[in-house]
């Protein structure tokens, strides 16, 4: 199952609430973190302090099997996940959101969460369509 989850980038409370919601859901989960404020990508802010007010620790769970950090903030997300105690082997990186799809294991039975920012909605829907294609192809191959 693919779940779209808008996580307002640069807003610690909004992201924390989404992470807590994901934690509360039963079953194994794979996450694609692409919560990037694309509107300021050309004049990118050097202030990622909101990430340190965000409860990434909610994602430090045995139920979360893979976290793929994608987009211009991929390395910032990786660092924050490591500081939250999430094992490095669960974290994968891709600067391109479509390339990030190749890093998801897509284990049968796992729910896949796409977490995206407000102005990244059109991109998130295009990524979701590619993900659906990958899932259908994987189903057909089995």
Mark where each language-model region is:
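ATP-dependent carboxylate-amine ligase
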Residues: 1-142
């Amino acid at each position: 199952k693919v779940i779209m989850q808008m996580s307002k980038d640069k807003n610690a409370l909004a992201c924390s609430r989404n992470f807590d919601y994901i934690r509360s859901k039963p079953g194994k989960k794979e996450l694609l973190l692409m919560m990037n404020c694309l509107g300021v990508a050309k004049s990118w802010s050097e202030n990622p302090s909101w990430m340190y007010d965000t409860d990434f620790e909610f994602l430090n769970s045995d139920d979360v099997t893979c976290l793929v950090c994608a987009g211009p903030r991929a390395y910032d997300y990786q660092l924050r996940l490591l500081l939250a105690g999430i094992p490095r082997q669960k974290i994968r990186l891709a600067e391109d959101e479509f390339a990030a799809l190749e890093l998801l294991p897509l284990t049968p039975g796992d729910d896949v969460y796409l977490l995206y920012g407000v102005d990244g909605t059109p991109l998130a829907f295009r990524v979701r369509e590619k993900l659906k294609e990958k899932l259908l192809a994987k189903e057909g191959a089995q």
